[in-house]
Amino acid sequence: MKIENNILKHYLRNVYFITGTAYAGKSTTVKMLAERYDMVFCGENYHIGVSDAVAMPEIQPDLCYRRELTDWKDFVRRSPEEYERWIYNSGREGAGFEIAELISLARDRKVIADTSIPLDILKEISDYHHVAVMLSPMSMSVDRFFDRSDPDKQFLLNVIDSCDDRDAVMENYRRGLARINSKKHYDEYAESGFFTVVRKDDGRDTRDEVCDTIARHFGLIS
């Protein structure tokens, strides 16, 4: 059975999506929008509790990777090419879980989601005024990846720090981040046709400005 895109779009009409590269301010903006406009908050990996429990290796092998992992050092030691492939394919495998979760939340309230749903699927299930792309220069998305206090990033940093060849592992992991946030992927976001906000590396605190810009794009304020 397949649910047609026009049906999904109807049931997702209260959902607003933010996607983009690392360190672009997605998590902060999603949180601010949820608080300011009484929206349901769906932060990064909001669907992971269900997908970890339900994903099947023969259907969603990349979503099952972490569940079957016995040593997180293997996670951070993967080749940059494999890490890039895994990240983007996990987003594609997880799209169905995200969509189902969002439909369950969005019947009576607006929802704001930090999403990994691929751009081509977003174009099918949503529209211009319900999607915003946030981008950062690669120097920020890679070099400052661990300059955040969120538990997932700090957990990975601790895993890397625990490796005997810590510096080599960190360099390998950063090469993976560079591939994930490469010019190729940056351009895919920038040229997607969706509304786009680019973070400037000038030291200014632009959180309120960016939040207002995206809220206006979403029609939450005039």
List where the protein language model places each region.
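P-loop (Walker A) phosphate-binding loop of NTP-binding proteins
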Residues: T21
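ATP-dependent small-molecule kinase phosphotransfer cores
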Residues: V50-K110, I117
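NTP-dependent small-molecule kinase module
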Residues: I3, L177-S222
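Short beta-strand-centered segment that lines the nucleotide-binding/catalytic pocket of NTP-utilizing
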Residues: Y37-M56
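Conserved glycine(s) of the Walker
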Residues: G25
